[in-house]
């Protein structure tokens, strides 16, 4: 038996419940992603792999096998029939199943799909298979796959994940007498929640209007404020006692990753 779990994001299209089902949006920009089994790893936008501390599993004859690829979402209905369509090496496979429920030990109820007796895909040693796309439809009607316009797909993904690459750009900043350098990042679309923040540890530089400068590791920032289409970042400028001044922050090669992806 193999067990697959597909989960559904907000802002779905008319029929396909999945975002980035053809894997074209890859804001992190890596060519490969590795899951060591200790935590959930996100790869291309909206898709993750995990074998540890999760109810999601792929099993064969009761034995857990490879890490499942999954997408989290919140509109699955228990008792409703769903149809998954998957194209592997351009061969289209379909399967319909009724949604069920799973009670966790924290008294949360998870709705999931269990696929029994699915098509088996044989991979020879050192061989590869290409998943062209995955669609999920409510009901038993299978719709023809429509590749989403990249710009639209990117905006839908950016509600959950936004990656800003500095690439030498500069932004206005405020350097205030409490000893902080503050600048605002404008988002291309509203994120679904206040995101977490990580960076690639590259150096950014604050320069005041008096040409005084201070460099910082980009990961030292604090997400100070989150608004409808903006994020305000704060860095410990350490110039205590100075009057409020206007300056510029040079992002250099820093990459800022803001994520609302489910854990």
Protein language model regions, located:
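Extracellular and organelle-lumenal recognition/adhesion modules and their flexible linkers in secreted
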Residues: 2-263
């Amino acid at each position: 038996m193999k067990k697959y779990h597909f989960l559904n994001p907000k802002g779905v299209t008319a029929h396909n419940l999945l975002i980035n089902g053809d894997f074209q949006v890859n804001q992190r920009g890596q060519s490969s992603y590795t899951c060591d089994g200790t935590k959930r790893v996100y790869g291309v936008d909206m898709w993750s792999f995990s074998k540890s501390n999760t109810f999601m599993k792929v099993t064969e004859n009761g034995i857990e096998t490879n890490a499942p690829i999954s997408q989290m979402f919140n509109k699955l209905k228990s008792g409703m029939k769903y149809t998954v369509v998957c194209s592997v090496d351009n061969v289209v496979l379909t399967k319909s199943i009724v949604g069920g429920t799973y009670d966790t030990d924290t008294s949360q109820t998870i709705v999931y799909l269990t696929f029994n007796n699915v098509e088996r895909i044989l991979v020879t040693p050192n061989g590869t298979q290409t998943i062209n796309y995955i669609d999920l439809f409510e009901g038993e009607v299978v719709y023809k796959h429509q590749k989403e316009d990249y710009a639209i797909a990117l905006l839908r993904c950016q509600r959950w994940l936004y990656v800003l690459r500095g690439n030498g750009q500069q932004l206005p900043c405020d350097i205030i007498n409490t000893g902080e350098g503050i600048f605002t990042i404008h988002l291309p679309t509203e994120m679904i929640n206040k995101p977490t923040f990580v960076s690639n540890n590259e150096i950014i530089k604050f320069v005041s209007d008096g040409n005084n400068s201070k460099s910082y590791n980009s990961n030292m920032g604090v997400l100070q404020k989150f608004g409808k289409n903006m994020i305000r970042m704060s860095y410990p400028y350490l110039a205590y006692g100075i009057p409020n001044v206007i300056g510029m922050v040079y992002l250099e090669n820093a990459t800022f990753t803001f994520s609302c992806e489910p854990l």
